[in-house]
């Protein structure tokens, strides 16, 4: 009988100057969180290097009905083996969503549908609202369960800071939302 352990967990790295054609190591980081999610398994850590990740309209992860999701997290970890998306050491990653402005559609910067995920230590800025009426947009919307959203700063946008619905047993710890 072979049982997986924490020793089986891998580390992936994402950096503003990375490439999704690279291996995702500290020396050859990926460019996108979506590619890192594709490669990550329960128990893995995605280290996000400091700098500005400038989201472009052609990098939108998903458009569904009246929503555009810039970053869509649908893959889940497991109990005791969350997938971690953490800022690397004391570095400050910033996800600038200000250039994503599809007309007449709601924009969610981080759409979290998966469970057993842990996000820590980065900023989300510039999320837009592009139409009048019920034009709600969100910096981070969580539908999953057993997630930890920790030390995020969601600011200087037109969107709701954090919107949590449907899921259960989530922890929102030391997050800030302002100038939204």
What residues fall within each predicted segment?
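Bacterial N-terminal signal peptides
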Residues: 1-4
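Short strand-loop junctions, especially beta-strand C-caps/beta-turns
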Residues: 17-19, 51, 98-100, 152, ...
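Acidic Asp/Glu-based divalent-cation binding sites
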Residues: 20-21, 43-44, 160
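Right-handed parallel beta-helix
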Residues: 56, 62-66, 70, 101-180
């Amino acid at each position: 009988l072979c049982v997986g352990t924490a020793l089986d967990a891998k580390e992936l790295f994402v950096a503003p100057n990375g490439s999704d054609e690279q291996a995702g190591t500290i020396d050859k980081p990926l460019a996108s969180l979506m590619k890192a999610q594709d490669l990550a398994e329960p128990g893995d850590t995605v280290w996000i290097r400091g700098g500005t990740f400038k989201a472009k309209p052609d990098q939108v992860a998903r458009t569904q009905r009246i929503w555009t999701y810039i970053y869509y997290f649908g893959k889940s970890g497991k109990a005791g083996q969350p997938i971690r998306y953490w800022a690397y050491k004391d570095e400050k990653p910033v996800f600038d969503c200000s250039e994503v402005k599809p007309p007449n559609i709601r924009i969610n910067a981080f759409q979290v549908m998966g469970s057993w995920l842990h996000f820590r230590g980065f900023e989300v800025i510039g999320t837009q609202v592009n139409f009048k009426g019920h034009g709600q947009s969100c910096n981070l919307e969580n539908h999953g369960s057993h997630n930890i959203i920790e030390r995020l700063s969601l600011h200087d946008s037109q969107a709701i800071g954090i919107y949590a619905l449907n899921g259960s047993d989530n922890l929102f710890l030391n997050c800030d939302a302002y100038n939204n």
